[in-house]
Amino acid sequence: MIQIGAIKLNDRLEIIDTFNQLIQPTHYVKLHPRIKRITGISQDQLCDAPQFCEAAQRFHAWCGTDCALLTWGCDDVSVFQQNLDFFAYSEPFPQMYDLQRLYGELTGDTKNRAGLKSAMEHFGIEPDADHPFHNALNDAYYTALVFQKCPQPQDVLRFSQTARKL
């Protein structure tokens, strides 16, 4: 895990804050060229970043006490939880919910896991050249835009997530 990205929305679903934290790897310290190409994150950027526990503490403080976390799919939750467990980080995070599952229900396709880009196209959301995919903050931004377009966004609360073993 090399980045945590999040967007904070208010009760009117307006973007009010962002969180972007790179994470210095402690085990696989050399960044694979494919990961660099996909994310746009360089080895030099990671060398100056805090390690996982400090990044998690910053994210936890940013989240505050009255929030829920939305993700697109279940993979990020499992990777995040795996890192929390590995580094013995014990502060509880807010409940996480899967917007991808709500989107599947909205479109009538609960068997396939639609990509974030497909959901954006469905809602007429254009990708921005300044926000390339596969960057945690940008993917969180696009997830927030899809959430804003959902007719009954509170329905996401039916899709709580628990981490699965990787």
Residue positions per predicted region:
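Conserved non-catalytic scaffold segment of RNase H-like nuclease domains
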Residues: 1-81, 93, 121-122, 128
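Acidic, Mg2+-coordinating catalytic module of metal-dependent nucleases/exonucleases
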Residues: 68-74, 79-84, 115-166
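Short, surface-exposed basic-aromatic patches at helix termini and helix-loop junctions that form
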Residues: 85-89
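Short alpha-helix plus adjacent loop in nuclease-associated cores
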Residues: 97-113
